């Protein structure tokens, strides 16, 4: 399985299908003032105009209700074209990933930028298994919710609370911290989701059983009985 040819090739810049020069800056005229803005080429899809300096240069801001024409950041992870029905992760069509890759393989792809080898996947799965348990105090956190609370806000609240129990990986500028927090979230979300469901139906929580893989473990914690 291979990504779409050319994905991630930032050197392939020319003209788009509207004939716009993808290498040129953009000149914006506001009254008598002309402001030059940078053009940010896209590896696929539409290019963008860099308006980050617009306020300083021209004293104005952009207005784009709903951010219909605004990209919040550049991304090498996801490409979406809703009108054309296209969704790609790291260059791979979502249909291809759904048919040929497991949940953990796609998770690895999103985090590290490439599909894992068999050894890398095994190591990744083992690492996730070391983080499936919840701190016991976080487990008791669920007791504060009414039984008829919808599982989604319960899950969202528990996820927000995780950082108060795991304060050794909170620096967003430290790649090691980001990686550890990502692994923890992947490992603990199935446990949190299962606990939220068990709370809603009045059944006792089940601890993770790491003899199972991630998906089997989630099903066990969600639907199993003591």
What are these model-derived regions, one by one?
Residues 6-21:
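Short, Lys/Arg-enriched N-terminal segments with co-localized hydrophobic residues
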Residues 23-226:
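Hydrophobic alpha-helical bundle cores within soluble ligand-binding/oligomerization subdomains
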């Amino acid at each position: 399985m291979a990504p779409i040819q050319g994905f991630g090739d930032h050197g392939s810049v020319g003209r788009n299908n509207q004939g716009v020069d993808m290498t040129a800056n953009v000149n914006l005229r506001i009254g008598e003032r002309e402001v030059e803005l940078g053009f940010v080429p896209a590896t696929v899809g539409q290019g963008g105009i860099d308006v980050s300096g617009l306020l300083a240069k021209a004293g104005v801001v952009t207005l784009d209700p709903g951010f219909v024409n605004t990209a919040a950041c550049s991304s090498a992870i996801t490409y979406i074209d809703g009108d054309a029905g296209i969704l790609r992760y790291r260059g791979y069509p979502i249909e291809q990933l759904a048919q040929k890759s497991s949940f953990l393989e796609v998770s690895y792809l999103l985090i590290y930028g490439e599909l894992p080898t068999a050894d890398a996947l095994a190591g990744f799965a083992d690492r996730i298994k070391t983080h499936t348990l919840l701190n016991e105090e976080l487990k008791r956190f669920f007791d504060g919710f009414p039984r008829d609370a919808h599982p989604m806000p319960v899950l969202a609240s528990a996820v927000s609370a995780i950082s108060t129990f795991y304060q050794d990986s909170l620096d967003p500028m430290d790649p090691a911290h980001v990686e550890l927090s990502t692994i923890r979230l992947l490992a603990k979300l199935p446990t949190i989701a299962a606990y939220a469901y068990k709370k809603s139906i009045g059944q006792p929580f089940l601890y993770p059983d790491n003899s199972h893989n991630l998906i089997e473990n989630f099903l066990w914690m969600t639907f199993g009985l003591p």
